[in-house]
From Swiss-Prot:
Protein name: Somatostatin-2
InterPro entries: Somatostatin, Somatostatin/Cortistatin_C
A molecular function (GO) term: hormone activity
Compartments reported by the entry: Secreted
Family named by the database record: Belongs to the somatostatin family.
Prosegment location in residue numbers: 1-46
């Protein structure tokens, strides 16, 4: 019986998360503001570097062709 109670709590948490994900963007923005106020305005986000911060030559893993004037585009 106790395990079933935990499962229902887990499912309700999943349902809440899915409901938040299905909200339109305006409602999600409002929800984020409510959460921000509830947490005292503190938000811990990890900064993610954009994927294009590596030079083009280094992103192309298999490109090692060299012409006397410079690297060729593969």
């Amino acid at each position: 019986a106790r395990g079933a109670g935990l499962l229902s709590q887990d499912w309700s948490a999943v349902e809440d998360l899915l409901a938040q994900m299905s909200l339109p963007e305006a409602d999600a923005q409002r929800e984020a503001e409510v959460v921000s106020v509830a947490t005292g305005g503190r938000l811990n986000l990890e900064s993610v570097d954009p994927p294009n911060n590596i030079p083009l030559r280094e992103r192309k893993a298999g490109c090692k062709n060299f012409y006397w004037k410079g690297f060729t585009s593969c």
